[in-house]
Amino acid sequence: MSKKSKNSSIEFDAIVVGGGHAGIEAVYALLKKKLKVVLITLDKKKLASMPCNPAIGGPAKGIITREIDALGGVQGKFSDLAMIQIKYLNESKGPAVLAIRAQIDKEKYSKLILKDLKKQENLLIIEDLVSELLVEKNRVFGLKTAKKQVFFSKTVIITTGTYMDSKVLRGSLAIPSGPDGQQTSNLLSNNLKRLGFELQRLKTGTPPRIFTSSIDFSKVEKEVLPVYNINFSFQSKHKIKKQISCYLTYTTAKTHDIINKNLGKSSMYSGLISGVGPRYCPSIEDKIVRFSEKPRHQIFFEPETKKQDIMYINGLSTSMPEDVQLEMVKTIPGLENAKIAKFGYAIEYDALNPLELKKSLETKKVKGLFMAGQINGTSGYEEAAAQGLVAGINAGQFVLGKKPVEILRNDGYIGVLIDDLVTKGTKEPYRMLTSRAEYRLILRNDNADIRMAKYALKSGLISKKEYLKIKAKYAKIDRKILELSKEFVSPKDELAKKYNLEKRISKLKLISWPNVNFKDILPDFEFGYELTVMARLKGYIQKQNSEAQKMIRLEKLLIPGDLNYEKVANLSSEALDKFQKVRPKTIGEASRISGVNPADIQMLLFHIKVLKMQKVSKI
């Protein structure tokens, strides 16, 4: 790597600011493209840390992690190596919403990533704080740090999470700090404001942690799980041998009384917090106020590491003062003698308005500047990692002079996530839900590999050989489906007796029945589950694919980049405002902007058609 004599500055292809889940994925994506990268982080021992729950996956989120893996990312691989428990969620609700969730040894996870990154060529890890982006003629060319270092690069990816001008809040205390007592980065926040970026205040929180030795496990319910032979990563061979349990208990009437009596002491309810919190992960104070009719709320004890010395108290996120936290904790069965290892807190921070972004996650204002993760208004490790991977891919494409990679809504939850952010924006921490995806029957846990394959190949994150291997897998499934359609079970066969068949039926039709175990028909076929899902959902899949094609046609209708929306006749005032702010690239994007109605789209289409006719008439 070439060093410049002035200011000890160094030239790189890309700089990644922040070593959280988004930053790590961005780094790996860039390294896979053979680019020279510097990662600037506050503490390299806390790479991809888990300051909130020690888990990866869950409804929709687990599918995102599978997509990250299929796209060439690393979250799934490292989760498999660090997991202490893994399970399926929503098994009874069908394959469209089936997802994986794993408890992670958070310390091991960070150590594995640091160890692996130390082996990587073309990577320099710096412990520092970014103070200023270097921008000239609306293009980023490097940055300065708090330690007076200067780095030049062709692109910069900001993945600062909840650290920008962040405050940790507990009771009446408001301390300038990042999560886990780390330094806040108000210098970068102020710099972004000076560059004209629109920032907003958001809030999240975390519960207290309890020393395991102080818990009375005789008063709580132990989660008993089978040993699932599953992984996040399609490539992983690591299997968990023993499931470490979580535990369930509940709040009590006494818990609720203490919270109600002390609401005014909560940072959230005292007016100390101005940021908007996550709708789908409310604090215990919010639960008691919003759901006052409920006599109790679930509380889960989740081990933070394999040592199991500290438990994360899921469901008890709070910004109460320490004395109130201790008082309410002791009213929960199993925690009467609890000793708190770390008190809960709320954290308020600056986040970018994601309408400032293109679908590539490059900013509209500054070329070569990309944003990913919680800085874009999302919540969750999985959502952050997905954005980091996409930003890393597209920063690499930018450096190499190639077109950006943009994942469509019908191809992945990652596509839904980014499309929602850049077309609708968000005023609260955005969490991925299966209900946000209109094509969720085709965005399943089992088929993430084939859905992401073309994007991974285009990105250069998988080889042509790996791509063809995935294609061969599904070709094999298609051939087996054809075979089963030609093979029949008669009423005299043993299989017919097991399932009370009264007439001859094809094996394909039989396997599509919900009560049939596919292993009875395909005992040795390695992709039996995938085939069964395809057989059972065939009609629904065809319908959603047809609907997706309509969406794709709208995506192909481009909107001129210099279009003057004020000249579009009969647009609603809200549509005009949103179009000018978002500046959608396609009619498809325009149609998904909140507040835009079908009449606005018709007016826009008509205006573009007139412009095209005027151009033709001038020729």
From Swiss-Prot:
InterPro entries found in the cross-reference section: FAD/NAD-bd_sf (IPR036188), MnmG (IPR004416), MnmG-rel (IPR002218), MnmG-rel_CS (IPR020595), MnmG_C (IPR026904), MnmG_C_subdom (IPR047001), MnmG_C_subdom_sf (IPR044920), MnmG_N (IPR040131)
Main location: cytoplasm
GO BP terms in the entry: tRNA methylation; tRNA wobble uridine modification
Annotated SMART domains: GIDA_assoc_3
Subcellular localization(s) per the UniProt record: Cytoplasm
Cofactor entry: FAD
UniProt binding sites for FAD: 18-23, 130, 185, 374
Primary role: NAD-binding protein involved in the addition of a carboxymethylaminomethyl (cmnm) group at the wobble position (U34) of certain tRNAs, forming tRNA-cmnm(5)s(2)U34.
Protein name: tRNA uridine 5-carboxymethylaminomethyl modification enzyme MnmG
Gene name of this polypeptide: mnmG
